[in-house]
Amino acid sequence: IVSNECILCGQCFVVCPQNAKEIANDVEKVKVMLAGDEPVVVSLAPSFIANYDGIGIEEMEKALKKLGFHSVEETAIGATIVKTQYEEILKSKRQNILISSCCHSVNLLIQKYFPHVLKYLANVKSPMQAHALDIKKRIPNAKVVFIGPCVAKKDEADHYVGIVDAVLTYEELTNWLKEQNINLEKGTKYEEKSKARLFPTTGGILKTMEQNVAGYTYLAIDGVENCIAALKDIENGVLTNCFIEMSSCVGSCIGGPVMEKYHRSPIRDYCSVVNYAGDKDFDVEMLDEFSVSKNFEYIVRKLETPSEDEIRSILRQMGKMRPSDELNLSLIHISEPTRQAEI
């Protein structure tokens, strides 16, 4: 996979029959942080309640503290900050189309393939980033580790240096807990002020927002193919006067590529999230607009087309010796095996 073509949707990791794709493991990096003097705080993605069904934030914090973390907070706190910024932008009517910028994979899709739509992408940091800044404002010397179901978040943390210090997947966390013989105990506690826990579901951002700006239609779109179709409609002037919640994963974050592989029940996952979310916003201290703003620039893609011999060599390295081995990865927009080798 060529990095400047990739949008980090993670579908190659999900569908590859040879398990050829591996995700960089940051557990050792986090262990080094924990061995230092600074407090290390976890920002836990709201999809955790789906991945670890029936295990609430209090129980997660107990387990993570045994690993050495200072404290555990919900990324949904940052989501509350972000959705409030979206509301303010819509109220100002500065632009007739606003696309949510929570999903780093969607952001990359627009930055690389739809530069004319960039002006509609909300210039707001992601919930992960907003929460990390909020934590560091309250605990100035803290290190922040995000834990969630997303491959793209590792790239987002690396690209925007100094905000999030490390990213772990649920799978990495689960394996680490098993190594230390730490068991997660069942138990959840309902909190009325926790509406942003809805964020990892399709339409979840919309459900947390005040949808009362006259003249705007509020839409939720998930899945890369549907996002591409919507972005083409925007380019062609078909869509206008709307706020679009856009997620690259079908089902939004609870359909993330590194939700643990044994855990593939979208209806149950959705119900876990909805039943855990409250009806009111978290109590948060808002960050100033400058701190939470984020600029997105066009990313130029440059490719040199390999020769036929080079393509065949690449396919052999991938273990694709026969035509039957040449899986058509249509989910990630590869129409033929030789094109797969090219990228």
Each predicted region: which residue ranges?
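Terminal amphipathic helices with adjacent charged low-complexity linkers/tails
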Residues: 5-10
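Domain-start "cap" segments at the beginnings of catalytic or binding domains
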Residues: 1-3
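A structural motif detector for beta-strand N-caps
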Residues: 15-16
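Short hydrophobic beta-strand motif reused across regulatory alpha/beta modules
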Residues: 12, 21-22
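Iron-sulfur-associated redox domains of electron-transfer enzymes in respiratory
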Residues: 24-332
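Single conserved hydrophobic/aromatic residue that forms the stacking wall/gate
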Residues: 332-343
